[in-house]
Amino acid sequence: MQENQQITKKEQYNLNKLQKRLRRNVGEAIADFNMIEEGDRIMVCLSGGKDSYTMLEILRNLQQSAPINFSLVAVNLDQKQPGFPEHVLLEYLEKLGVEYKIVEENTYGIVKEKIPEGKTTCSLCSRLRRGILYRTATELGATKIALGHHRDDILQTLFLNMFYGGKMKGMPPKLMSDDGKHIVIRPLAYCREKDIQRFADAKAFPIIPCNLCGSQPNLQRQVIADMLRDWDKRYPGRIETMFSAMQNVVPSHLCDSNLFDFKGITHGSEVVNGGDLAFDREEIPLQPAGWQPEEDENQLDELRLNVVEVK
């Protein structure tokens, strides 16, 4: 009996520790990109996946202690996929007591009608979903739209654009919609997918799989995701370093004339700080930038096992 109680305390301690890390990551992203401001009404897009559940949970947690006032409204788009368990999210949100809206639109039927069998449905599905969510945000008076993309999603997008699109373009933590009417934020931008997965498992969120893309295992994004996971296992710190690189761009050392005036470099031009490496090899640090040793969740401080709630 005592052993079972001890295991429960250790599991609770680890969950609290993980939640604190996710809170810290989300809080830093919100501060760095000014994602949430006084009086904001945040429309939290809830798909039924681990990422959006985690985003809603962490935002609700932060809402209780934030120095500013903001409100949340959870929105789920029921795309009328066959077998979609409509009751799952409804029951979860009712139990949670959060304001919510379920939007019903048969985008599944449109996608199946327009996209040939075996072809990727993601592009059309995303466009349809985006339009509906923008419209819903206007109806609800939302000032920000929160999406559940995390750090790994952002890196995957960068490599997808480099490998297949010939562009150095990622997924911004904050953006303005093309029509200039909506601000989209990604509060999980600094969060690791493996942390989100562990948190979702521990909280036992009622996960709902996407039937539209679940039958497309060879998507380009999945190939990139597998590559990044392999790198993370074989070369600890590489993922952190790559994400750090996205925040430390040096236009003078790339090849885009739109970002840096290479043609304007003449005798007497202003010196670019750190730019004189024409004849030298740049020194690379022994440890990857931004890397920290993985925390050993099993090495617990016995004196702190009575922690039961994150404040």
Curated annotation (Swiss-Prot):
The keyword RNA-binding appears for this protein: yes
EC number of the protein: 2.8.1.-
Record localization: Cytoplasm
Motif (PP-loop motif): 47-52
Pathway in which this enzyme or protein is active: tRNA modification
Disulphide-bonded residues: none
GO biological process terms held by the UniProt record: tRNA thio-modification
InterPro entries, per the entry: Rossmann-like_a/b/a_fold, TilS/TtcA_N, tRNA_Cyd_32_2_STrfase, tRNA_thiolation_TtcA_Ctu1
Cofactors (names): Mg(2+); [4Fe-4S] cluster
Top-level class of the enzyme under EC nomenclature: transferase
Cofactor binding notes: Binds 1 [4Fe-4S] cluster per subunit. The cluster is chelated by three Cys residues, the fourth Fe has a free coordination site that may bind a sulfur atom transferred from the persulfide of IscS.
HAMAP family in the record: TtcA
Quaternary state and interactors: Homodimer.
Function (record text): Catalyzes the ATP-dependent 2-thiolation of cytidine in position 32 of tRNA, to form 2-thiocytidine (s(2)C32). The sulfur atoms are provided by the cysteine/cysteine desulfurase (IscS) system.
Name used for this protein in its record: tRNA-cytidine(32) 2-sulfurtransferase
Gene source species: Shigella dysenteriae serotype 1 (strain Sd197)
Species lineage: Bacteria, Pseudomonadati, Pseudomonadota, Gammaproteobacteria, Enterobacterales
Gene name in the database record: ttcA
